[in-house]
Amino acid sequence: MTNVEVAATVAPNQLLDTLTLDNIKEYSNDIDIIELRIDQWEDRHLELLKSNLEQLQELNINANVLVTYRTISQGGKGEMTHEAYMTLLKEIIKNHHCQMIDIEWDSDFDVFAHRDLINLAHRYNKQVVISYHNFQETPDIDILKFTYYKMNQLNPDYVKIAVMPQDKEDVATLLEAVATSADTLDAKVIGISMSKVGLVSRTAQGVFGGTVSYGCLGEPQAPGQIHVKTLKQQLLFYSNH
């Protein structure tokens, strides 16, 4: 059984609104990480990010901020070219006061460029979540384990896979990959089977060696997300049994 951190995903249109800020404050005891999505912004990413981070700092709560730009190819709204995406992440790493950054992984990407970016993040004392998302299916167990293995080779702090299940067997496949990888890899493992079918992957993550579960404060930002308070309660239930 591993300790599982709760990440609350927020995706402001521009600045964080009063309701979201109040919710973060109200449920701060249930939140370990605030995932700030920025792919919904069409432009002014660095300017808006600076303002959002200042808003979160003013709350004075004990939670790390994870900045995520999710591309269309991995289920987000981000339309940047890969080169522009990598440049944006470099600027965020060097110039913004967040504690964590999400870096997408794909088998077609330049391994050396990704390793350099992760090393840069570590030089600026930022933790790295390297992530892979598949909104169409759950790959075979061997592909999932190999993906975790390849991501781990880049020396991130966390390796994350989120996939779409078609049935309960797909959920079991994802959780088996999480359990095996958690026992063998240096990085902390995150595994999410999306939608209602995969809810157990969020609530029982710690049973299988997972380390972070993503929830919401209002409207879910990914299929199957539940409110952070409910998520925290469910995680505690599994940790006490």
From Swiss-Prot:
One Pfam family linked to the record: DHquinase_I
UniProt entry tagged with the keyword DNA repair: no
GO molecular function, one term: 3-dehydroquinate dehydratase activity
Superkingdom classification of source: Bacteria
Enzyme class, first EC level, given as a word: lyase
Entries under Gene3D superfamilies matching the protein: Aldolase class I (3.20.20.70)
Keywords from the UniProt entry: Amino-acid biosynthesis, Aromatic amino acid biosynthesis, Lyase, Schiff base
Pathway assigned in UniProt: Metabolic intermediate biosynthesis; chorismate biosynthesis; chorismate from D-erythrose 4-phosphate and phosphoenolpyruvate: step 3/7
InterPro entries: Aldolase_TIM, DHquinase_I, Type-I_3-dehydroquinase
GO terms, biological process: 3,4-dihydroxybenzoate biosynthetic process; amino acid biosynthetic process; aromatic amino acid family biosynthetic process; chorismate biosynthetic process
Keyword Ligase assigned: no
Active-site residues (renumbered): 133, 160
Reactions listed under catalytic activity: 3-dehydroquinate = 3-dehydroshikimate + H2O
EC number(s) stated in the UniProt entry for this protein: 4.2.1.10
Binding site for 3-dehydroquinate: 35-37, 70, 202, 225
Protein's job: Involved in the third step of the chorismate pathway, which leads to the biosynthesis of aromatic amino acids. Catalyzes the cis-dehydration of 3-dehydroquinate (DHQ) and introduces the first double bond of the aromatic ring to yield 3-dehydroshikimate.
Family stated for the protein in its record: Belongs to the type-I 3-dehydroquinase family.
Cross-referenced PANTHER family: 3-DEHYDROQUINATE DEHYDRATASE
Subunit structure: Homodimer.
Protein's name according to its UniProt entry: 3-dehydroquinate dehydratase
Name of the gene: aroD
